[in-house]
Amino acid sequence: MIFEIIKIGSQPINFAYPIPLLSLLAFMLSGSGYNELIISYIFAFSFFTAANLWNHLNDAEDDLNAGRNYARFLIEHRKIVTEFVVAFYFVSFLLIFFISKSKEIALLLTGLSVVLTWLYSDKIFIGKIIRRFKEDYKTEVFTYILCSFSFPLSFWTIFSEISQVGVVFTLATGFTYLSGFFLKDLKDISADIKSGYRTLAVVLSPSTLLIISVMLFIASTFVVIFSSLLDVTPTSSLLVLTVYPPILFAIYKFHKEKWKITKNIISSLKIYTYSYLGFLIAFAIGCKL
């Protein structure tokens, strides 16, 4: 049972968990030890397992109707899974409380992330009183903007006190995560309409979502480029420029199709998506050259 719970909690994949890129980037940028590297990944594992499990649990009925087999497991073990969610969130708090090098602000930011991700998904408890945040684009965007920056900043405090370098880390990874959020909404359009949600995927056109995603991703690269030119991060972090050829190629293909989501840009979307990983890897390697 525990293995199944952890497996479900690892979806969807992101660059903090189960992919350990956020930990590796912070490790290389901060120059901290391996203890911080390991603890940061445990923190990411705890937080994202809780947030993902809670989201899947609240969507279990809809997911079961959509043919997702894991949903039946969640429905049958709703109480136990809820207890695991609370436990994993609690572990996140404990790690920050004992390990963070800027404890007060990190606890505040972690608490903010926990509350927002809970309200984002919840329709079992508080969601019976107020509309859960994921069902309306205003609260959806509010949640993602705050969590995209509050989580990496609290994450950074495992490695070091808040500093200019920590702010660069937060902005670069935050804009990247936000970019992926707008891209993710593209695949949720039909499901959100069917469920009666007013999410970004419903109120904005697919073309607009794609354009915003690209702009945010470019913003994340600019953060690293300017921080390098201003000597906040190593000059070698300009290695992130190597991701521009695939990004520009993808943008060219998107523009050629007038930013419409067609089968002609599927391969370009894959290239664009892999550029996220390329950017973070290049940033991490550049910090050590």
UniProtKB/Swiss-Prot annotation:
The keyword DNA damage does not apply. The keyword Magnesium does not apply. It is found in: Cell membrane. InterPro entries: UbiA_prenyltransferase. Keywords: Cell membrane, Membrane, Transmembrane, Transmembrane helix. This is Uncharacterized protein AF_0771. It holds the Pfam family UbiA. GO terms for molecular function: transferase activity, transferring alkyl or aryl (other than methyl) groups. It comes from the Archaea. It is a multi-pass membrane protein. GO terms for cellular component: plasma membrane. Coiled coil: none annotated. The chain crosses the membrane at residues 13-32, 37-59, 80-99, 104-121, 141-160, 165-183, 203-225, 235-252, 265-287.
